[in-house]
C-alpha cells in the first residue's frame, strides 16, 4: 500500500480519484490547493507519492511549484503530474526529476498503469506487502 497525497482543485475529480485509489489499497490524503497540500505534507511523514494537478485554482503551474517544495522537504518523494492543458516543453522541463505525467482525461486503467510502470506501485505488490 502506498500513501498518496492527491492535489486536485476539481472537487468531483478529487473525490472520485481518492475513492478509487482507496479501493486499490492506498492511503489517500487530499487537498484542493497548494497551501492545503503543504500543510498535509508537513503532518504526514509516511507519504510516498504526490499526485498533483499542474494548475490549481487558477494558479498556472502551482502544482509544479508544490512538487519542488515537496521534493525539497522529502527528496525520495515520487511525483505524478496531471493536467488537461497542453504543456510546452519549457513547462515540462520544470517538472522535478524522476517524475511522470498523466494527461487528463485519464481512465482508471491508465492511472494504474502509470503507478505500476513509473513508480512500481501495483495492487499485487500491495497485497504481497500486506500479507507478509
Protein language model annotation of sequence segments:
Residues 8, 83:
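Conserved acidic carboxylate
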Residues 11-29:
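Two-component/phosphorelay signaling modules centered on CheY-like receiver
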Residues 30-49, 57:
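Acidic, metal-coordinating helix/loop segments flanking the phosphotransfer/catalytic sites
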Residues 42-45, 69-76, 94:
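Conserved phosphotransfer cores of two-component systems
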Residues 51-68:
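Conserved phosphotransfer microenvironments
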Residues 84-89:
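Negatively charged, flexible loop motifs adjacent to catalytic sites
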Residues 92-102:
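As written
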Residues 106-119, 123, 127:
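C-terminal output helix
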